[in-house]
C-alpha cells in the first residue's frame, strides 16, 4: 500500500455525531470502535469513540475520535482541510453541507486568481477550504 496522509480529528465527546455528519456529506463507509469495545468499563467512556474512519469512493479518508479524560481538547486555527478540483457541482455540494450550521469566513465566490474559493468552519469546529478551479485541457 502506498503511503497516505489523512486528517485525524479530535472531538470533545461528539465524534460519532461528527463522523456521521461527514459520512452524509461525502458518502462512503464509516467504521467505529468504542472505548467499551476495547475493554474500557468506565461508564463515561463505554459508548465514546476511540477510533473512527470514513473511507469514501472518491478516495477521501477522514479519521477521528473522542478526547479521552485526562487528554486535552484544544481546538485551534492552525490547520484547515482543503478540498479542490474542477467538479464544481460536487465541490459546491460539499461546501453547502459543510457551511450549513457553521461559520463562513470567506464566501465561496470567484477570486482574483480566477477560481471560486471559500473558507468555513463547520458545526464541529473543523476548518475547510474549498477551491473550484477551471477544468484544464
Spans of model-derived segments:
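Vicinal oxygen chelate
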Residues: 2-3, 31-33, 50-55, 60-66, ...
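A structural signal for short, well-ordered beta-strand segments
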Residues: 7-9, 79-81
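Core segments of cupin and vicinal oxygen chelate
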Residues: 9-59
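Short glycine/proline-enriched turns and hinge-like loops at secondary-structure junctions
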Residues: 45-46, 74-77
Amino acid at each position: 500500500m502506498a503511503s497516505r496522509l489523512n486528517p485525524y480529528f479530535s472531538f470533545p465527546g461528539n465524534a460519532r455525531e461528527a463522523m456521521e455528519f461527514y459520512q452524509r456529506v461525502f458518502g462512503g463507509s464509516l467504521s467505529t470502535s468504542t472505548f467499551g469495545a476495547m475493554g474500557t468499563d468506565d461508564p463515561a467512556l463505554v459508548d465514546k469513540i476511540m477510533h473512527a474512519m470514513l473511507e469514501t469512493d472518491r478516495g477521501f479518508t477522514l479519521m477521528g475520535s473522542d478526547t479521552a479524560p485526562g487528554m486535552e481538547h484544544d481546538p485551534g486555527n492552525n490547520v484547515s482541510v482543503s478540498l479542490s478540483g474542477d467538479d464544481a457541482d460536487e465541490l459546491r455540494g460539499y461546501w453547502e453541507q459543510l457551511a450549513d450550521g457553521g461559520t463562513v469566513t470567506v464566501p465561496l465566490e470567484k477570486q482574483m486568481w480566477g477560481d471560486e474559493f471559500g473558507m468555513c468552519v463547520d458545526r464541529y469546529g473543523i476548518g475547510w477550504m474549498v477551491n473550484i478551479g477551471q477544468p484544464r485541457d
